[in-house]
Amino acid sequence: MDATNNGESADQVGIRVGNPEQPNDHTDALGSVGSGGAGSSGLVAGSSHPYGSGAIGQLANGYSSPSSSYRKNVAKMVTDRHAAEYNMRHKNRGMALIFNHEHFEVPTLKSRAGTNVDCENLTRVLKQLDFEVTVYKDCRYKDILRTIEYAASQNHSDSDCILVAILSHGEMGYIYAKDTQYKLDNIWSFFTANHCPSLAGKPKLFFIQACQGDRLDGGVTMQRSQTETDGDSSMSYKIPVHADFLIAYSTVPGFYSWRNTTRGSWFMQSLCAELAANGKRLDILTLLTFVCQRVAVDFESCTPDTPEMHQQKQIPCITTMLTRILRFSDKQLAPAGRV
């Protein structure tokens, strides 16, 4: 839903703290919002899973047990067993697929003003990090699925990793294509090690800019206290099929995600700024910690005409199954070849 008042919405549109003169904050939730507050999503609830509805639970939903569909899974070892860092010395960095959703056929969904700014900024920084970037605009679900299936079917042997970014409306466990909602595990499941062997042991990165619900985070004011002044690396080894995933959500489950109509979403602004400044220096988890810090500290919604949406906060949510340190080392400085 995009709650709109004075240019602000919840994907939601927001502004940096200290810039109250530009009230352009909105959210990426579902439904509509009037002066009375957030609207309902209209989503059909999915069945519960013992692992929950978050990223880990959704990945587990896509798992086929050996008893039902056994096959011997073997993939080429691209990194030594106990290497501290991922091998980022392949010929190519890898694919980066950006699904940018601005307009929708679903009547309850408003257009996402500001998303093209996010898309342009993300495209630029990913190219600087040597990704091969492809942008898909306002795709229907069947086209998203076809694109993802094709990407997963390619030979990624000469690539370091793969990255998928989705910018859209959403609810907890769901995200919207142009025409309908879908579960995010419908995307991730194509890239598990048993389904995409050429990406086995390599990072699979997903960045989701969308609401995960309609709850608001009013924040807490922090005040200063008055008193304050690993075996043989050459041997083969097995890995779980769901290893080496990282899923970065713009917000925590159940909550709004804010977007500024002129500068883009808080999360993408922060992610792009950190990738541009530190993408080749810091490892990804350290970098994402600073992304969380930027979103949490530097931004606050400005919707004075809608008091219940005014001065709200946001914090991204990172789910990681990475098994090594990931750093986007400079391709021109890294030696050629693979481990």
Swiss-Prot record:
Q: What does the subunit comment say?
A: Heterotetramer that consists of two anti-parallel arranged heterodimers, each one formed by a 21 kDa (p21) and a 12 kDa (p12) subunit. Inactive pro-form can homodimerize. Dronc and Drice can form a stable complex. Interacts with Diap2 (via BIR3 domain) to form a stable complex. May interact with some isoforms of Dark.
List the Gene Ontology MF annotations in alphabetical order: BIR domain binding; cysteine-type endopeptidase activity; ubiquitin protein ligase binding
Function, as annotated: Involved in the activation cascade of caspases responsible for apoptosis execution. Acts downstream of rpr. Cleaves baculovirus p35 and lamin DmO in vitro.
For whether the record's keyword set contains Hydrolase, the answer is yes
Q: Which UniProt keywords apply?
A: Apoptosis, Hydrolase, Protease, Thiol protease, Zymogen
Q: Which protein is depicted?
A: Caspase drICE
- The answer on whether this UniProt entry bears the keyword Protease reads yes
Protein species of origin: Drosophila melanogaster
Q: Which InterPro entries match?
A: Caspase-like_dom_sf, Caspase_cys_AS, Caspase_his_AS, Pept_C14, Pept_C14_caspase, Pept_C14_p10, Pept_C14_p20, Pept_C14A
Q: Determine the domain of life of the protein's source.
A: Eukaryota
Q: How is its activity regulated?
A: Zymogen activated by proteolytic cleavage; cleaved by the initiator caspase Dronc upon apoptosis induction.
Instruction: Give the record's family classification.
Output: Belongs to the peptidase C14A family.
Region Disordered: what ranges?
Answer: 1-45
Write out the GO cellular component annotations: cytoplasm; nucleus; plasma membrane
Active site feature: 169, 211
| E.C. code | 3.4.22.-
The GO annotation for biological process reads: apoptotic process; compound eye retinal cell programmed cell death; execution phase of apoptosis; negative regulation of peptidoglycan recognition protein signaling pathway; negative regulation of Toll signaling pathway; neuron remodeling; nurse cell apoptotic process; positive regulation of neuron apoptotic process
| Originating gene | Drice
